[in-house]
Amino acid sequence: MKLVIFSKKFQELPLPEFGDLVADMGFEGVDLTVRPTGYITPEEVVEKLPEAVDILKARGLEVPMITTAITSAEEPYAEETFKTASECGVKYIKLGYWKYKGFGHLRSQIDEIRRALKDIQALSKKYNVTAGMHTHSGMNMSAEPAILWEILKDFNPDLVGAYIDPGHMAVEGGLGGWLMGMDILAEKIRMVAVKDYGWFKKDGKWIARTVPLGEGLVPWRKVFEILKRIEFKGPVSLHSEYKGMSLEEIIEQTRKDIKYVREILKSI
């Protein structure tokens, strides 16, 4: 497993400064945002992704994965993104999200997504990369692991696999759902996101909010024991998506989070 950091919360920093920070925090690489409002926009990918990879490599960092908003092989810059990523040595590409349209649409949407993924799989094969669907809680078609398995069951996971996020999985199934989700998706898992959630009451309603690792719903030791058991070798992307924190506070918390993860990895 390679520990990388998701760049989303650090985009106010120039990339060289961000790279210095990431190296100092002890990460092995970066999960770089290549999407609208990302470090790199889709329009810039051909020119700027190679530059970004070189900047980070100069600081001893890999870029094993990028985060995109791609949901169709036909959309503008989709093929350019896959091609450029491959040329830069980026192996893993996070896809965008398909929103659930509401009751009565589930089965037709599963079929619709499968059709889109067939073309995305062709891009993955052409450029020797792995695309991943992220288990994001809420009104996303990939929120529930069992539904994601139904979507992915006929695809080669080395071309189109699962990008699991135990934090989001625990939001959807905090007792046994996350565990059954890892179980059903085990052979499909190619990327892992790390963040934790807790439930809080706000204005009379329960909301899920990001909390420091080890303080939320996810039993991280068990998660990493399972990943070791299934011989997971892909990137582990740490998501410092804390709300209400300054950048300095996010950096401080991220240092604590990576220490927490490394201590677990050393002990299992």
Where are these regions (language model features)?
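Acidic/histidine-rich catalytic cores of soluble enzymes
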Residues: 19, 122-217, 224
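Charged helix-capping and loop-helix junction motifs
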Residues: 44-50, 77-81, 107-117, 144-149, ...
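A short, acidic, flexible beta-alpha connecting loop/helix-capping segment that sits on the rim
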Residues: 10, 237-248, 252
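A short helix->loop->beta-strand "cap" motif at the edges of active sites that frequently abuts
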Residues: 61, 90-91, 129, 230-234
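Short, small-residue-enriched loops and turns at beta-alpha junctions
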Residues: 38-41, 70-74, 100-102, 137-141, ...
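H/E-rich (His + Asp/Glu) clusters that bind or coordinate divalent metals
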Residues: 221-223, 231, 235-236
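Active-site groove signature of glycoside hydrolases
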Residues: 91-106, 127-138, 237
